[in-house]
Regions:
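Phosphate/anion-contacting hairpin/loop surfaces
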Residues: 1-187
């Protein structure tokens, strides 16, 4: 059984995120739209493809979307959770696919701009949709309460994958990563 680590952004570390200039979704610093509008850079995230319920057909993602970052001069992240989505660089997506990330719930190419519509990076990014109920949970949390309302201090898997998603709500904005990848990530 492989030991896993949680790889994501802790809501308790907003100060650390601010130092690294990672935009904070919870504070409205990230807006997503199908068409960039300089008068409404952060519209409500209410598109046919942005929300769906179990049992209904999941609408296809658009070919591209705009991600607008407030107060940004550049892009300072490889992945960023946004509701039931991840904004992630193509480089990061390629890396996690190499180590077992095989989920495919739909994605759009992302154009990252500031509030003036100026391009913030030439690097390719994607908006990757996550469908919680489609995730086969291959993770064991030995110290998690039966009601799954808490966070576990330990997680393990028997999966061949080294990068997994969890169907546990508390881990929805994070990746579960095999400890043996720690050094590769730091490269």
């Amino acid at each position: 059984m492989k030991k896993l680590m949680v790889w994501g952004y802790s809501s308790q570390s907003l100060d650390e995120l601010a130092k690294r200039k990672v935009p904070k979704v919870s504070l409205g610093e990230v807006g997503i739209s199908e068409v960039f509008n300089p008068k409404k850079t952060h519209p409500d995230f209410d598109f046919p493809w942005s929300w769906f319920v179990k049992g209904q057909e999941i609408p296809p993602m658009p070919e591209k979307v705009y991600v607008c970052l407030k107060k940004a001069r550049g892009v300072t992240f490889d992945f960023l959770p946004y509701n039931d989505f991840f904004i992630m660089s193509a480089r990061f997506l390629e890396f996690i696919k190499e180590y077992g990330f095989d989920y495919d719930f739909g994605m759009s190419k992302v154009i990252i701009v500031n509030t003036k519509g100026e391009l913030l990076t030439n690097e390719v990014y994607y908006l990757v949709r996550i469908v919680d109920w489609e995730i086969q949970d291959e993770i064991v949390y030995p110290d998690l309460a039966l009601d799954e309302d808490d966070y576990s201090l330990e997680a393990y898997t028997n999966s061949d994958k080294d990068i997994l998603l969890s169907s546990n709500y508390n881990y929805s904005g994070a990746f579960m990563m095999s400890e043996n990848l720690k050094e590769k990530i730091l490269e």
